């Protein structure tokens, strides 16, 4: 990946388009089924489905996409703490947090 490619990944138009895709996916049966387990993907806390948020494992700002393999249900606490961290960065953060 070149620097130019990285910049194109975080283009505001691309991020807007990916957020729109996420809104559509949020209405899908697939997403309703994912939330039905009532568990945060990250901390495994029991959380009512209506309180689970959609998180991009690889954040949009870091080149992630709104595709099923990149979307997980998570509690608001984890989503707020994770922000734009990549999975390895998130794991390191949690290790230091504990």
Language model regions located:
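Histidine-centered catalytic micro-motifs used for acid/base chemistry in nuclease
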Residues: 53-59
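Cys/His-enriched microdomains
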Residues: 38, 52, 69, 73
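Short, non-ligating residues that shape and space the ligands of small metal-coordination modules
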Residues: 49-50, 81-85
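Short beta-strand-alpha-helix junction that forms the catalytic/metal-binding core
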Residues: 63-81
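Short, charged surface segments at domain edges that flank catalytic/cofactor-binding sites
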Residues: 2-42
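Short, cysteine/histidine-rich loop/knuckle motifs that typically chelate Zn2+
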Residues: 41-44, 77
